């Protein structure tokens, strides 16, 4: 018995020792955690048990030049529910959601779907599911009728976790009924791709997709507010730890004048309908044309865009609440003219005779005599192809100014061909083409830098471009040259033979920069393409003395109190080094276009003494289509202020369709007080060329802008009788009665004729 007690006592002592050791170990570990590693575990505890609730900032407005809003925020009521309260309910909050649905007249399943986390098993597809955080209030219903909200407000105890908040969505007041839809842009929901690398975006937020909404998204969106809360391990709210208020976005004040913008939109739409009607009357099969175009007004010194219209336009209210698939299809439908595309900056057209304002200074640098007259025959011959004047008209002997007034094509063919020949013709290598260089000097072939997204660079087709173009297509054309075309592909035997011959020619010699390329280039045809805004910048440079400016829609950014926080000033990108006499002659020619030349009928009752104008028409002809009409103009007083541009695709001549739209713009600008009347003793801009060149040079030097000039490479006189033939023996033959002037080695499927008014 004594032995048994001794054994039991030993076991008790051993157990006590083990317990003591365990207590000491646990106590030591606890001390380590509480004292030695206190900061580490306190931080871990805080991180694990805190949550952030994001408060969206009010988005800034987009304002007209006078401060009236083009885009504003419209407050409306939104019903939200706290996800934490839902989790505390036995049915996960389903009964609360159903009760809210009954009160606001909504489908319970739709509202319940909005509470389900996107990607979970029972969640509908985005955006009908919840993409917010676990503690972010969930939006159940938006734009609710105030009468339906009364039960929620009067008996909040019946709807635990439910709140009625005032939120904002975009509204478009349309000042003066102006839309400016493509310029303003639109918003859509933030996508997962948008979130990559961005900590300023929220999955439930909106982001600018186009126009000013996209370009100035950072300024407009503001800074979100954040409330940091402590929660228990079970997720229950404990207390608010920290709160940061949201900071409203900045308002973007533009240079847009609503009255001028409205006229630009309406006049474009009206002349588009007239052109379509006239074309259909001429050809009953010609339907659905003249649907695209653009019109603008820009300050020639600052690049400020006073009006920026794109045809066809659309009502921006289509974005309210999001577009459906049918609406989106209409916005991108080519048969409807792709309303979503901003034709001002994203669409390109052959500039046609408006390009002669670049080619004349080039030809002048190659030896033109300002005191001579130059013949303007109906046609000239390059290789075995005739290149004709617009409507095959002959105008006799003309001064350089008169050549611009009547828009003589054949004079430019002659000048550009001689320069091409002086450079080595088709055998030229590593040459500097003055026509190409000055076009690039005016900014063509590069984006203007305007504060709008999705801008096209256009195309200046030099020798390098043609080689690259040929290399990209030669395999297909060489294969066609070998296999030919089947009767099923082209039933007409003559057309089939033409296609096969064209494929053979392109396969073997499509890389050559030929005389046809050169003469097409000189009048803005062939493969030359520009955006409307690019050509406006060209004419602004002519009006201001040579400075190529960067256009701007936005003027400044304002905070909620109206204080200026940012100024969006423009810059001189580069300078065209005009010869004084060259600029004078060019300006005189452009002034004559409006008073005596191709655009004179549209301005026959205009007060030229008080408000002198200068401009150039253009008619770009593309095989198989109606012509694209152009008119670019500027006020031609001592200090030119504005340039206007109008282009209408697939319509007719520039004098018939584009010039009348410009006339409407100038009428409105005069009535709005934007034009300064010329004093009787003040010179025209052509007579003030020297002063403008000096002022432009000083500004360009201050901006550090490069000056672009061209050298005389022709080394032969451009004076004298017109050559009866510009014969190039190794160029292929073609039908001499063919009025087109496209390059004979171009892609046969995209032929363009060289003709302009």
Model-predicted segments: where are they?
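Beta-lactam-recognizing serine transpeptidase/beta-lactamase-like catalytic domain environment
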Residues: 233-239, 243, 293, 301-353, ...
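N-terminal leader/targeting segments and the immediately adjacent pre-domain N-terminus
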Residues: 152, 248, 252-269, 699-734, ...
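Solvent-exposed, acidic/flexible segments
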Residues: 55-56, 72, 89-93, 133, ...
């Amino acid at each position: 018995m004594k032995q048994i007690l001794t054994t039991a006592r030993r076991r008790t002592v051993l157990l006590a020792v083990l317990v003591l050791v365990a207590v000491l170990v646990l106590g030591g570990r606890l001390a380590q955690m509480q004292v030695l590693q206190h900061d580490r575990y306190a931080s871990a505890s805080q991180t694990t048990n805190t949550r952030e609730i994001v408060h969206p900032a009010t988005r800034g407005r987009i304002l007209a030049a006078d401060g009236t809003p083009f885009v504003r925020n419209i407050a409306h009521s939104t019903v939200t529910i706290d996800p934490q309260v839902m989790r505390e309910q036995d049915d996960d909050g389903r009964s609360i959601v159903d009760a809210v649905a009954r009160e606001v007249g909504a489908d319970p399943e739709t509202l319940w779907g909005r509470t389900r986390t996107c990607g979970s098993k029972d969640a509908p597809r985005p955006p009908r599911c919840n993409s917010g955080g676990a503690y972010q209030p969930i939006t159940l219903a938006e734009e609710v009728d105030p009468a339906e909200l009364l039960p929620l407000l009067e008996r909040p105890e019946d709807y635990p976790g439910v709140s009625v908040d005032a939120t904002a969505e975009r509204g478009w007041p349309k000042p003066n009924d102006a839309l400016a839809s493509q310029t303003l842009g639109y918003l859509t929901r933030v996508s997962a791709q948008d979130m990559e690398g961005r900590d300023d975006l929220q999955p439930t937020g909106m982001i600018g997709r186009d126009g000013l909404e996209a370009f100035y998204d950072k300024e407009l969106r503001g800074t979100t507010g954040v409330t940091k809360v402590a929660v228990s391990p079970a997720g229950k709210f404990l207390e608010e730890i920290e709160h940061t208020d949201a900071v409203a976005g900045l308002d973007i004040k533009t240079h847009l004048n609503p009255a001028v913008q409205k006229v630009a939109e309406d006049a474009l739409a009206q002349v588009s309908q007239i052109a379509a009607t006239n074309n259909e009357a001429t050809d009953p099969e010609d339907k659905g044309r003249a649907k695209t175009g653009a019109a603008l007004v820009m300050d020639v010194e600052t690049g400020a865009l006073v009006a920026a219209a794109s045809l066809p336009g659309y009502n921006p209210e289509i974005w309210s609440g999001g577009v459906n698939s049918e609406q989106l299809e209409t916005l991108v439908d080519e048969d409807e003219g792709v309303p979503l595309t901003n034709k001002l900056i994203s669409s390109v057209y052959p500039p046609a005779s408006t390009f002669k304002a670049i080619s004349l200074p080039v030809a002048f640098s190659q030896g033109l005599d300002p005191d001579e007259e130059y013949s303007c025959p109906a046609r000239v011959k390059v290789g075995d192809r005739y290149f004709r004047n617009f409507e095959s008209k002959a105008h006799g002997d003309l001064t350089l100014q008169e050549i611009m007034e009547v828009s003589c094509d054949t004079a430019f063919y002659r000048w550009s061909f001689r320069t091409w020949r002086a450079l080595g013709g088709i055998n030229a290598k590593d040459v500097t083409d003055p026509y190409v260089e000055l076009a690039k000097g005016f900014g063509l072939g590069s984006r203007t830098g305007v504060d709008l997204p999705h801008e096209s660079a256009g195309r200046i087709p030099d020798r390098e471009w043609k080689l690259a173009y040929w290399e990209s297509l030669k395999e297909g054309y060489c294969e066609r040259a070998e296999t030919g075309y089947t009767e099923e592909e082209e039933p007409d035997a003559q057309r089939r033979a033409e296609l096969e011959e064209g494929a053979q020619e392109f396969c073997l010699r499509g890389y050559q920069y030929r005389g046809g390329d050169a003469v097409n280039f000189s009048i803005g045809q062939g493969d030359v393409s520009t955006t409307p805004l690019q050509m406006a910048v060209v004419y602004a440079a002519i009006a201001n003395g040579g400075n190529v400016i960067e256009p701007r829609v936005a003027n400044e950014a304002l905070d909620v109190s109206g204080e200026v926080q940012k100024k969006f000033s423009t810059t001189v990108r580069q300078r065209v080094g005009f010869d004084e006499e060259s600029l004078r002659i060019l300006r005189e020619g452009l002034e004559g276009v409006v008073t005596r030349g191709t655009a004179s009928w549209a301005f026959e009752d205009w007060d030229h003494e008080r408000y002198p104008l200068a401009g150039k028409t253009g008619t770009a002809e593309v095989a198989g289509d109606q012509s694209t009409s152009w008119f670019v103009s500027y006020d031609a007083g001592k200090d030119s202020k504005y340039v206007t541009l109008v282009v209408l695709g697939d319509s007719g001549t520039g004098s018939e369709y584009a010039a009348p739209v410009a006339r409407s713009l100038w009428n409105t600008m005069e009535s709005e007080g934007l034009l300064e009347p010329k004093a009787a003793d003040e010179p025209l801009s052509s007579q003030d060329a020297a002063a403008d060149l000096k002022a432009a040079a000083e500004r360009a030097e201050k901006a550090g802008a490069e000056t672009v000039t061209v050298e005389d490479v022709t080394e032969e006189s451009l004076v004298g009788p017109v050559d009866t033939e510009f014969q190039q023996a190794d160029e292929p033959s073609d039908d001499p009665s063919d009025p087109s002037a496209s390059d004979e080695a171009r892609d046969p499927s995209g032929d363009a004729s060289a003709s302009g008014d």
